[in-house]
Amino acid sequence: MLLRSRLGFIKAIQIGLAFLLVAPAYFVPVVAASSEVNVYSGRKEALIAPVLEAFTEETGIRVNLLTGKADQLRARLLSEGRNTPADVLLTSDVANLHRASASGLFQAIDSRLLMQRIPSRYRDPNGKWFGLSIRARVIAYAKDRVKRNDLSTYEDLADPRWRGRIVVRSSTNVYNQSLIASILVAHGDIAAGKWVKGLVENMARRPQGGDTDQIRAVASGEADVAIVNSYYYGRLLASGKDRDREVVASVGVLFPNQGDRGTHVNISGAGVTAHARHRSEAIKLLEFFSSPKGQRLFADINHEFPVNEEIAPSPIVAGWGSFKADALELATLGVYNGDAIRLADEFGWR
C-alpha cells in the first residue's frame, strides 16, 4: 500500500516493497543519476522524512528510503551482501548499531565534521557509526501516589518497597537490554543480576506493550512507576488529544541517578554501509544530520536531545530541565548486550 503525504513523500508501508523516492514534490532532479543516496531506516518515515527533504533541498542529492524493523534491515543487508543498494543504515539504540557493525555491515569513515560535532562517547571509536540524537531512559511516576523525593536511582527500583508497583516493557526490546548493560558495567555481573531479579519481583504485571503503554498504565492506576524512554513522554506532551493531555497531567518524569553516574542515555545513529555505492553522498547525509539544521529537525521531530552539544533542545524537551547523563562510552553497551540478554533470561525478565 502506497500513500503520498502532503509534502510529496512516498511512504513504504512494508519492508518488502521496492525502494521509493523520497523527495519534495517540487524538486525535479537535474543532476546525474549518481547524485543520490539509498537509506535503510529503522525509524519510521514520518520521523526522518523532513530531514531528508531538507537535505535534498540543500544539496540536490536525491534520497531513496526503505523503512523496516532493525532486525529485518540487518538481515536484508546480510542477504544482499555486495549487491545491496543501501548506502546508509539508520537505526535506534547502540545495541542495534553494534550488531550491525559486528556483522560487518558498516565501513569506517573519516569525517572532520562528524568528529567535531559528535562527542566521542556517542560514536564508534573506529568511525563505523555515529549517534545522531539522544534519548534518556527515565522514570515515569504517578504524581498523586508517588512523591518525587521517593525516587532516586534505577537501583532503588529493585527495593521491596516497590513490590507490585512497576511496569516496564519486555527485555526483548533493546532499550531494556542496554539499560541492563549499563547496570552491569557500573556494578558487575552479580549485582546486575540481583537488580534484574528485584525489578522483576516488583513488576505490577507481565511485561507488555511499548513505552507509551507503560506511561498509560501509570496514569490509569495499574502501576505507580514505569521505566521509559524520554521521547515517548514528549510525544504525549506534544499531542493535541484530550486523552494524552490527561495522561501527562497525572504523570511526571524523573532523571535517575543524578547523585552518582547520571541517567542512562542512548542514541539513534547511522553508518555508511560496507558496500555503499554512493559513499560520498552517504557521508554528506550523515554530516547534514549532525549540522545545526539537521540536528534541530531530527531532534525536535522525535522529541529527543541533539547529539551536537551546540544545539539547544526543543522547548518541550528543554522544559524537563537539565540533567546529568551517564558519561559511559556507548559502544561499551553494545559489547555487553549479550550478557544483558543472558541476565534477563536467567532472572525472568520476559
Language model regions located:
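Short beta-strand->loop
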Residues: 40-43, 107-115, 125-126, 129-130, 141-143, 149, 155, 242-264, ...
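A bilobed periplasmic-binding-protein/Venus flytrap-type ligand-binding module shared by bacterial periplasmic
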Residues: 138-145, 265-278, 297
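Ligand-binding pocket segment of bilobal, Venus flytrap-like solute-binding proteins
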Residues: 171, 175, 182, 187-256
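An extracytoplasmic/periplasmic, membrane-proximal ligand-sensing/linker region
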Residues: 303-350
